[in-house]
Curated annotation (Swiss-Prot):
GO terms for biological process: translation. GO terms for cellular component: cytoplasm; small ribosomal subunit. This is Small ribosomal subunit protein uS14. Zn(2+) binds at residues 24, 27, 40, 43.
Length: 61
């Protein structure tokens, strides 16, 4: 329950700009956040491997 309240609190518009927390829009994870995609690294990997993120492909060299 504590995690759910933290997610809801992070999604609300903060009174001050410095109080803003970056959280994944899909799962609410606070760590490993990728700003460009607004999701955590785990969700990014899952959706990128399924091909659901346009312009992202697995790199190989």
């Amino acid at each position: 329950m504590a995690k759910k309240s933290m997610i809801i609190r992070a999604l609300r518009k903060p009174k001050y700009k410095t109080r803003q927390n970056n959280r994944c829009k899909l799962c609410g994870r606070p760590r490993g956040y990728l700003r460009d995609f607004c999701m955590c690294r785990i969700c990014f990997r899952k959706y990128a491997s399924q091909g659901l993120i346009p312009g992202v492909s697995k790199s190989s060299w």
